[in-house]
């Protein structure tokens, strides 16, 4: 028997959020196995400390077969300021 809440064929995602709170120019990069739930947590002040008190929209996500792949890409995206800037600019169009 599979315990409740256990995902089968689970995928992981690296994602980027853009703050839509007026006057705030912030982005956030993370990883998750449930994009909708994670975005809901960020927007209900139950997400990462740096996202609390702001409203967020999902502007980018990339799907992976393993948690390690998603975490590795998250690290790279967090440190690639050029790519983050391009993704933010693309989201403004």
Please annotate each region the language model reported.
Residues 1-50, 54-57, 61-83, 89-93:
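GIY-YIG nuclease catalytic motif and its immediate N-terminal context
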